[in-house]
Structure formats: structure tokens, C-alpha cells
Amino acid sequence: MTQTFEIAVIGATGTVGETLVQILEELDFPVGTLYLLAGNNSAGASVPFRGKNVRVKEVDEFDFSKAQLAFFAAGPAVTLSFAPRATAAGCSVIDLSGALPATQAPHVVPEANAHVLEGLKKPFQLGSPSPSATNLAVVLAPLRGLLDIQRVNVTASLAMSAQGREAVSELARQTAELLNMRPLEPKFFDRQVAFNLLAQVGTPDAQGHTALEKRLVHELRAVLELPLLKISATCVQAPVFFGDSLTVSLQLGAAVDLATVSRALDAAPGIELVDEGDFPTAVGDAVGQDVVYVGRVRAGVDDPAELNLWLTSDNVRKGAALNAVQLAQLLIKGLA
């Protein structure tokens, strides 16, 4: 008889939480009891799972000793409040919010550093990195031993869904207002986002860097196990509902062999290489898929030691929910 596990999902009514529940069902994860949890504003709602509607309960009232593993798919404040309570009750934690530092909750991407999970003692705390860091790690993992990567420059064009349903609704509303020639009234954002790009996502610090940009840098170094890697990151808000797209430039220690790079990417897990003059897009390729699409693989215009890439993926699915569930799949033997 197949062993099952008691699973809790915190933030179950959010975009990532709902997708995570969907993936648990799609991958036939051995769930015994599924506890769906959220704040009091969402408690009482229902989320479908295996042909039934599972009622969402208030996280503040949950006894974490009932669960063996909890996915934290809500905001950082929720993780900081309830993750310690979960582990104190013997429940292991996978955090998708970025609230827990890598020294406390190792950040793991299965395609890049799955070995970190070996010998992990329960109850454990793990971090599933931000979608940008996760998907960039998937692509750089097969290249880090092949190339002398000295610097990574990345510009991440982020989808609205990264900021939740309110941001998605704001883009839809602004688009409708503009197409119908009605006055635009920004609400969630402080300015127009429809048919526009915003140069920053979040409030910058005194040095001009946003929390998302710093999170991308720290998590990518941790996952690739290259603590001294120089990384420059810029996150911009793009007017798309789902699917992040990243422009990546790698400064190398020697001239790049594009054929070798393409072979490595084509053979790597979690990657779909699009070449021969074509290129992938978030809407046309990535949304709803379980891989990172890579295209426009090329050397620098006048620098043979520069490698440029374009990559796109479903930020909610591949970049967040799927990564967390794949971690759980690797860990369930240790949860018994």
C-alpha cells in the first residue's frame, strides 16, 4: 500500500497556492489529508482537489502537528509568523516567500543543487527561490562547470501574477479603460501599467536596488553554490499576466563555443532550447508549461567571451509551485 503524507498549503487561495494544489493533483503526489489555509479574509473559500472542493481554513487556528509538510505560498510576514510554529510542532516547511534566509532554510532548485537534500533531518525548513532565480538557476546549472562564468547581468521582465490577483486585475482593468477611451485611474500601481514598462518593482533602497533584485542575486549565488559570483540584476514590471522573460548576458573567462553551449542546454533537464532562428515567448510558449524556454543563444557583438541568452517561463508554475512540489517529491522518503 502506498504511503501517504499529510500536507498543508498556506496561501491556498493565491495564484501560487492554487497552482500548487493543482500540481499536487497532476503529479499524483501521495497526499493523505490536504489542509488548505489562508488568512481570515479567504477562510471559508473552496479549492478543487481530486474531484472535491476542499474548504480553506484560517491559518491562525491550525494545529501544525496534524501535517508533515507545509508549503508556505503566502507573503513573507505569514511565513515569519507561522513557519516557526510549524517546525516546533514537527511539521517540515518549504517556503516560497523568500522570508527565510538561506542559512536557515537552504534554497534548492532540483536541477541545480538537489544534493543539498541528502541527509536532511526533519522537521526541516527549505526555501524555494523566487521564479527569476529558480529559472535562471535551471539554465546556468549545466553551464557552470562548462564555462568560466565571471559575471552575470540579467534584466527580468516580470509578469503581473508575481504580485497576485490584485495586480492581474489592475492590468486587465487599465487595458479595458484605455481601449474604451475612458480616463485611467491607477489603483494597485501608482501609474499606468497597461501598454507600459515600469523600471522598478518595489521600492529601492538607498543604493537603488529593490528587494526583488537583491533576492535574485542572493538566491542565485546560493543555488549555484558560487558565493563570489558577480551578479547585476534589474527587475522591471511588464504588462503581461503570466510568464517572466529574462535577458541574460554572461561575461566569461574565455571565448564561448556556441555549439558546446547549445548541446549542454539541449541535454539538460527542465530546459527547452529553441534555436534555428526561432525564439520563445511567454504567451506563445511558456505559460502552463513545466520547462524554461531558452533562445537567442549568441556571443557578444564584439566580445567572443560574452554569452547572451533569452529565457522565458511560467513564473507561477515552473518558477514557483512546480519547483516546490518537485522538492517535496525528492523529500517524501525522509518524511516517513
Predicted segments with their positions:
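N-terminal Rossmann-like NAD(P) cofactor-binding subdomain of oxidoreductases
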Residues: 2-191, 228-230, 292-293, 297-303, ...
